[in-house]
Amino acid sequence: MTETKGATVRVAVEDGIAMVTVDNPPVNAISQAIRQGLIDAMAEINGNPEVAAAIIIGAGRYFMAGADVREFDKPALPPSLPEAISSIESSEKPVVAAIHGVALGGGLEVALGCHYRIVDPGAKLGLPEVALGIIPGSGGTQRLPRLIGFAKALDLISSGRQAGAGEAAEMGLVDAVAEGELAAAAMDFIRQRIGAAPPRLSAIDPPAPESQDFFETARARLARRARGQESIVRALDALEAATLPFDQGAKREREIFNELRGSDQAKALRHAFFVKPREVASIGVVGGGTMGAGIAVASLRAGYQVTMVEASSDALTRGLGNVEKNL
């Protein structure tokens, strides 16, 4: 075995198979270092004649839980995630994503850029970007419908929900569910595909929508459901761009992503994602009747300082009495 040490991405070669391990605790967020590490790893793999295929896997509990959201409010640092994914997809040697834990957002987009996908039975996959006021911006809206069709792709992207391993296999999102240890299963899987031309989703002709009025009907339905949330409706705009040649559709997707990233809605949702609730030290209770006294008693028992407010001193005295009776 040979191994190249890196800060966040490691490459180990054994019996002609390169194991590319993404290691960025706690959730393997796809930071600038991860993006650069993936590009460097693919260059090393394709330049090594002893390597016939590669596996991309995550260290710890997850494959990759998405982009590093903390970077969204800062100037973009190269390389971009689309560039990193392109370096994987363009590999002349087959690459399989070995997914455990979760592959979410950019993590699933990385997996879609791999030629194959194998998952642990407990894995979850999804594109939850709409919950942050954005859309998948690294080819997810372009590759996913080419793999599973527009209807299923729209369901996953517009809802942001996660699909389990069984559902992912049934819809064609993954190629196999691992039996036994994931890394070993991925090794067996990719060995059987050495020498075959790696399938690339970006090379597939644009798919036809399920019906002639698919986008029109979906847009009306999503507008009602979105209730003003821009990202849900704009996700459909990006998906519709998948009817174009891949490069054109990917360019449109990135334009929409960048427009949404700087929007007030996205900024507010990112704030809500990171904000921590303020610590509560004291509680005010208005009214000392049965309900107010009950709230006061529960709060006191939980260790909070309680201030009771009533309309008169007599009512306050009765309220305090109600509290004392229940303590």
In which residue ranges do the predicted regions lie?
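Conserved CoA-thioester-binding segment of acyl-CoA-metabolizing enzymes
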Residues: 1-59, 83-86
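Amphipathic alpha-helical segments at domain termini/boundaries
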Residues: 1-22, 65, 109, 113, ...
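An acidic, glycine-rich surface segment that forms the CoA-thioester-binding/catalytic face
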Residues: 39, 69-101, 140-142, 147, ...
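Glycine- (often His-adjacent) and acidic-residue-rich active-site loop
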Residues: 57-87, 103, 131-134, 314
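Glycine-rich beta-to-alpha active-site loop
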Residues: 87-132, 136, 164, 287-290, ...
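Gly/Pro- and small hydrophobic-enriched strand-loop and loop-to-helix capping segments
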Residues: 115-137, 174-187, 309-313
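NAD(P)+-binding Rossmann beta1-loop-alpha1 motif at the extreme N-terminus of oxidoreductases
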Residues: 275-326
